[in-house]
Amino acid sequence: MAAKIRRNDEVIVLAGKDKGKKGKVTKVLATGKVIVEGINLVKKHQKPVPALGIQGGIVEQEAAIDVSNVAIFNAATGKADRIGFRFEDGKKVRFFKSNNEIVSN
């Protein structure tokens, strides 16, 4: 199945503690989850590793969020939107369902 949400897409969170927040997708995981910049922050207790120069302590980092809990943000409408696929000039392109505009990659 083609990826409806890809890296560098602007998304809005639909459910969870960060509902309504917008962010940029930094990574799409094969498990059906995405990592969004500044969203779903968790505290990790990092053990120091002097050989690698890693300092210990409590570190905040982004955790994965299920792809069903985010929707692509349509800048033209200012709302969350759905994605469709169609062929144009022999290439498969993504488009917003609300206004049929092609999603820029």
From Swiss-Prot:
KW Translocase (keyword) present: no
Subunit and interaction comment: Part of the 50S ribosomal subunit.
Gene behind the chain: rplX
Keywords: Ribonucleoprotein, Ribosomal protein, RNA-binding, rRNA-binding
GO cellular component: ribonucleoprotein complex; ribosome
Transmembrane regions listed in the UniProt entry: none
Protein task: One of two assembly initiator proteins, it binds directly to the 5'-end of the 23S rRNA, where it nucleates assembly of the 50S subunit. One of the proteins that surrounds the polypeptide exit tunnel on the outside of the subunit.
Family that this chain belongs to: Belongs to the universal ribosomal protein uL24 family.
Coiled coil: none
GO BP of this protein: translation
Pfam families named among the record's database cross-references: KOW, ribosomal_L24
Protein name: Large ribosomal subunit protein uL24
Alphabetical list of InterPro entries matching this protein: KOW, Rib_uL2_dom2, Ribosomal_uL24, Ribosomal_uL24_CS, Ribosomal_uL24_KOW, Translation_prot_SH3-like_sf
Organism: Vibrio campbellii (strain ATCC BAA-1116)
GO molecular function, one term: rRNA binding
